[in-house]
């Protein structure tokens, strides 16, 4: 039982590391999202300014660039959701492992107490 408790604790440590890595990854992706959104907003403003100056060619160019960025933003949002789902799944597994380890330790303690009483 001691060996399996140690193995479970190693699994728990690895799961926590993996979760931390996913969280760092998703934070990085969220920063990408923020930058993309800022660029999209700038292209919207540039488009409005070009329309006011009646420069349709520039306005069309800005709209095209904005749409390309919007597509990247949509892909980024999908990546964030995918990572968030992985994080949630890992957190559930971590909780399950913590409960299982706790039960195993309690059982070990109970058996040790019985052994002491029996002796």
Language-model features, listed with the residues they occupy:
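Long, charged alpha-helical scaffolding segments
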Residues: 1-19, 61-119
